[in-house]
Amino acid sequence: FTRKLFGFSDRKEDTFIGGLSMGGFGAVRCGLKYHQTFGKIAAFSAGFVLYQIMGELLEKGIITDDKLMNKAYKENIFGAPETLRTSEVNPEYLVERMLEEHVEIPDMYLTIGTSDFLLENNRSFCKFLRERNVPVTYTETEGTHNWEFWNRQLEPAILWLLNEGEQDNSKAITLPHN
């Protein structure tokens, strides 16, 4: 629709997806699921909460309400908890499947504040990617889960998406794809 309405390029290398918080999770998930459409993915403070949901299921055998999401919300967003490991809603599953099928994985840019409550989740996902030699630019800088942080990170992310300008990658970890 947008390509026809606005005359956007239909080339994968010209098409990016990004988001923040749960939208960052959604951008990663959609960018991987629709890898034939998106050339790059940018996620700010991505809501990689599947780790907690799957951990809770393994630990307690049930999904419960917590301060961020109640059980019904979790199930509406992510589906049946017992299927999360092998569900297309799980970015790790999508990556594993793409690697098995030798499908090109879009480059990813992940950024997170060092005081963000999702820091460990983002580190875990970056580690997962790194262990599989999936290309990722990952940055941790001072900040928390708010617009002040995201506004500061927007310009470096856009420059990365467009392959333009100089960036301070002193804290970035760029992993080549083998």
Pin down the residues of each PLM region.
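Non-catalytic cap/lid and distal C-terminal segments of serine-dependent acyl enzymes
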Residues: 1-178
